[in-house]
Amino acid sequence: MALRTRLGEILRPLNAEYGKVAPGWGTTPIMGVVMLAFLVFLLIILQIYNSSLIIENVDVDWSNGIV
């Protein structure tokens, strides 16, 4: 027998739709756009780190770290 707790009773409605899938594509296009934006963000960070992308007044000298 499962233990019934107050927290479990509060969270039960969130699990009521478990296993049900909305028809069609749903939010898949939104997820794709967000993933693409995150990829662009990571590429920009990588280019800044690799000094491939030069930004004025931004020093990327990693030799003398903050002590």
Swiss-Prot record:
InterPro entries reported for this sequence: PSII_PsbH, PSII_PsbH_sf
Membrane topology qualifier: Single-pass membrane protein
Transmembrane segments: 29-49
Entry's Gene Ontology molecular function annotations: phosphate ion binding
Secretion signal, residue range per the UniProt entry: none
Compartments (UniProt record): Plastid, Chloroplast thylakoid membrane
Gene Ontology CC, one term: chloroplast thylakoid membrane
Chief localisation class: plastid
Keywords, in A-Z order: Chloroplast, Membrane, Photosynthesis, Photosystem II, Plastid, Thylakoid, Transmembrane, Transmembrane helix
Keyword Chloroplast carried by entry: yes
BP GO annotations: photosynthesis; protein stabilization
Function description: One of the components of the core complex of photosystem II (PSII), required for its stability and/or assembly. PSII is a light-driven water:plastoquinone oxidoreductase that uses light energy to abstract electrons from H(2)O, generating O(2) and a proton gradient subsequently used for ATP formation. It consists of a core antenna complex that captures photons, and an electron transfer chain that converts photonic excitation into a charge separation.
NCBIfam families: PRK02624.1 (NF002728)
Annotated family: Belongs to the PsbH family.
Quaternary structure and interacting proteins, as annotated: PSII is composed of 1 copy each of membrane proteins PsbA, PsbB, PsbC, PsbD, PsbE, PsbF, PsbH, PsbI, PsbJ, PsbK, PsbL, PsbM, PsbT, PsbX, PsbY, PsbZ, Psb30/Ycf12, at least 3 peripheral proteins of the oxygen-evolving complex and a large number of cofactors. It forms dimeric complexes.
Name this polypeptide is given: Photosystem II reaction center protein H
